[in-house]
Structures are given as C-alpha cells and as structure tokens.
C-alpha cells in the first residue's frame, strides 16, 4: 500500500469493518470483462456467504472463474473545504481476495443463510426447504485482505 499511514493491518479491526458493513461488493471477471455486484452478505471465520438466484450473470461468471475480489466500507462521509483540492473523504474499507464455491448441501445452505441474516438481524429465521433448494448460496474463502482508512484522528 502506497499510503502506509492509512493502512489497517490488525485482523480484528478488519473484521470489525466487515461486521459493520451493510454491503459487500463482489468483483468477478470473465476473460477481459470485469463485473461488480453489490450484495447482502454474512461473514464468519474468514468466509463470506452470499446468496441469490441460481441463474444469471454472476452465477455464470463464478462457474467459469472462482477467483474474486471483495470490497466493504463503512463510516463514509464527504469532508468539504473552501478549496476544491482540500476536499476529502472519511472512510474505512477492506479489500479481500478469495475463491468462491457453491454450497449445495441443504444443511450447509441453511447455516450460510443464518449467517447472512445474522449480519442484519438478531432474530432467528425459518427457511422452507423449497426456498433453500431454489436459492444459490456461495461461500468465499478469503485468502488475503487489507484495510485502509482516512479522516480519523486515531490513524
């Protein structure tokens, strides 16, 4: 990272940013064609879980190439100033790299869906078997991640 003073290396701090993020941006590629989608997600033990339709561009791309990049951010705010060149942004972000795989076991899919819902709610949910079968669940094992922050006094 070029700006070492903005780098976040502490694993707990990185996981806290992920845990407090509302959106995971999943980047994939098909040859020379990049594709990014914002998704609801869940995080547990170094793995990101996402879900969606079993058909579509995201699914097609992940079947061809399981290598992905992830982005999470929180505490984003524009910091204005008198001069244009002094404007800035406050943020904390995490970029992660990993490998995606499809979860097919029904019990594992339910666990992943619980983890996803746990990102947004403290409630327990029931997932009907027919809905679990119809839902694509993807696990992404994070192989590396880095964080960056700007606009915080404790940098």
Name the predicted role of every residue range:
Residues 1-20:
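Extreme N-terminal tail/first-helix region
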Residues 2-5, 75-155:
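Charged, gly/pro-rich active-site loop segments
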Residues 17, 40-41, 60-62, 85-88, ...:
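Short, conserved, surface-exposed binding loops centered on an aromatic residue
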Residues 19, 63-68, 114-122:
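Short, intrinsically disordered, mixed-charge
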Residues 21-54:
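Short beta-strand segments
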Residues 23, 36-38, 67, 91, ...:
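Broad gene-expression machinery/nucleic-acid interaction feature
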Residues 42-78:
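A short mixed-secondary-structure module that forms the rim of ligand-binding clefts
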């Amino acid at each position: 990272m070029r700006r070492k003073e903005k780098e976040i290396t502490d694993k707990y701090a990185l996981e806290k940013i992920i845990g407090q993020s509302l959106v995971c941006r999943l980047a994939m590629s098909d040859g020379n064609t990049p594709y990014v989608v914002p998704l609801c997600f869940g995080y547990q033990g170094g793995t990101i879980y996402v879900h969606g339709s079993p058909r579509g561009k995201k699914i097609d791309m992940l079947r061809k190439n399981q290598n992905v990049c992830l982005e999470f951010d929180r505490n984003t705010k524009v910091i204005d100033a008198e001069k244009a060149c002094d404007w800035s942004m406050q943020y904390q972000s995490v970029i992660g790299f990993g490998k995606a795989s499809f979860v097919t076991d029904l019990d594992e899919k339910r666990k992943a869906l619980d983890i996803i819902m746990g990102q947004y709610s403290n409630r327990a949910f029931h997932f009907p078997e027919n809905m679990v079968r119809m839902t694509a669940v993807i696990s992404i094992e994070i192989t590396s991640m880095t964080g960056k922050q700007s606009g915080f006094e404790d940098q």
